[in-house]
Amino acid sequence: MKTNFKRFFKVIFLFSFFLFSSFLLSAQTSYYVVKGKVIDKKTGKPLQGASVFAQNTTIGEASDSAGNFSLGLPDGGYSLVITFTGYETETMRINRATSQNDSLIVELKPEEQELATVTIAISNEVKDGWAKYGSFFRDNFIGQSKFSKLCVIKNPEVLHFYFSKKRDRLKVLAKEPLIVDNFALGYTLKFAIDSFTNYYNTKSNLFIGYPLFVKMQGDSAQQEKWAENRAIAYKGSLLQLMRSIYSRTLKEDGFELQFVINNNGEDFPIHLENLYGALNYKMDDSTKTVEFYPNQSEVAVIYKKADPEKIYLEMDTTAKKNFQLSDIIFPKGETFFIEPNGFFYDQEDIITNGYLGFKKMGDMLPYDYEPE
């Protein structure tokens, strides 16, 4: 049967984004501690009040008067993000092995103000950018799902919009964190946004940024509703997929993967008899890290335990109604790695289409979310 697996929703992620799972973490999840010190790269002096957090989690703190920080993290991999006003953002990949090393020294480089001024001067900043592009940004950054509709951007004034007619591109920058209240999932999200770029000609988005989650306070009824909604958001997400690959439980968790072959402009699904062999799955017993690379660059992802949202079916009238269909494009010949918590890399090298592209920030859960 011929099936067109292409969908018009496409998004490229450069950070640990939409990573959820049906892989159940144990209540006795083990932790490790990452310690370090934040200093000025030029002077070597400690920086007090630097924001240090594990990206896409609820775990973070500010450095103390000596520039020191200490984070306890559930087993797995993370991207550690360090920000400080007037300095360039620093990121580093960490896992349990990092905690076995000496205290990290994080050197932050002061921003080059002259270069920043010149860059802004020659760009095409849109006057009243929020009034003109705010709705578009919200739909493509927060999303259009039912949970996205319950998100509120608290400080849109920090956003600056730049449109390039020559490149047919809209870029959004922010010097301060963008604050978003997600009343559907019970989180306040603080986004350190490097840039959000929409390419109109390819209908694709590129987001470079670092979210931190803060749990909202609510009464028992609110907490119960948030828990219910988080469980819904958890199903069929990218981390559910990655953790299912990691634990070799794709079928049990409701996923089916197929390779997609294009022949004369038509996409044909190829059923995989030896799924993990086709992914070249390999577990490193010493690091507990899984590496894989699909034999085919385009992989269709079918999730059977939840139907697509009504609004998605209205936006894409060709979509199937009884399962969620996405595809992921992997670069040929590149190996990917998955940590025990579903963190995978390099994430900047994949493109998600279809239902996974439809789900955006409004459906995000933090890495340290554990299903009940």
Spell out what each predicted region is.
Residues 11-22:
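Bacterial N-terminal signal peptides
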Residues 34-40, 67-69, 106, 118:
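A short, amphipathic beta-strand motif
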Residues 24-33:
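Beta-strand-rich domain onsets/edges
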Residues 104-372:
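Surface-exposed, low-complexity/disordered segments
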Residues 57-68:
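Short, acidic Ser/Thr/Gly-rich low-complexity loop/linker segments typical of extracellular
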Residues 54, 81-93:
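A short, solvent-exposed loop/turn motif at the edges and junctions
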